[in-house]
């Protein structure tokens, strides 16, 4: 899975995902499925904001890469991918400037056109179930929620999908491609199934002798980037317990 992530995603996204995991004591080389999940979420956030600008009249326009429109204002502020301190600094600045209510949890984006924060979710389950879980957690009508799935489904607050159909189709196509590429490498089942992931992790760790370089301290903290992906992948408490149960050198 680690090789797939490094081949499939932009190096900048990979680097940001590594930093996010390491900040919370998580090892991308061990928790490779989580690594892939964070990269996927980051890429969706970046694709969401790509090519979208606000012109001098305050209207939202789409400008393809390479067009000479440097004076245009980006429609979306990307919050996801920043370290927590900087992310909250950006959020506070936006709230002070616009008067928008400060969110309880770090959102992923801010939409300058609609003047609202956006929470992006990526899931393989029923989108409406994940949407309700996300809404129940956030408990704020001020934060707009937009959920994507690997099957091409989506759900958004009040059926307001923010982006044009073509931009959303680009994201859906990318998610479908990731799924197909994982499946072709035999990685998809373990990526979405905790039971299969447990079996694969046990198999991988048994093949490592001696147990050199494996982490001794197990983290029970959940990284912000991963929270938006649950339950696409196991939460860190379950992952940590699983990892702790298998990080034992085989008896001679």
Swiss-Prot record:
Subcellular localization, as worded in the UniProt entry: Host cytoplasm; Host nucleus
Domain of life: Viruses
GO aspect biological process, one term: viral translational frameshifting
Family: Belongs to the influenza viruses PA-X family.
Gene Ontology MF term list: RNA binding
Protein name: Protein PA-X
Record: active site: 80, 108
Site residues (Important for efficient shutoff activity and nuclear localization), renumbered to this chain: 195, 198-199
Predominant location category: host cell
The protein's role, per its UniProt record: Plays a major role in the shutoff of the host protein expression by cleaving mRNAs probably via an endonuclease activity. This host shutoff allows the virus to escape from the host antiviral response. Hijacks host RNA splicing machinery to selectively target host RNAs containing introns for destruction. This may explain the preferential degradation of RNAs that have undergone co- or post-transcriptional processing.
Residues with site note (Important for efficient shutoff activity): 202-203, 206
Provenance organism: Influenza A virus (strain A/Chicken/Scotland/1959 H5N1)
Domain notes: The probable endonuclease active site in the N-terminus and the basic amino acid cluster in the C-terminus are important for the shutoff activity. The C-terminus acts as a nuclear localization signal. The C-terminus is recruited to host protein complexes involved in nuclear Pol II RNA processing.
Pfam family, one: Flu_PA
Assigned keywords, A-Z: Decay of host mRNAs by virus, Eukaryotic host gene expression shutoff by virus, Host cytoplasm, Host gene expression shutoff by virus, Host mRNA suppression by virus, Host nucleus, Host-virus interaction
Gene from which this protein is expressed: PA
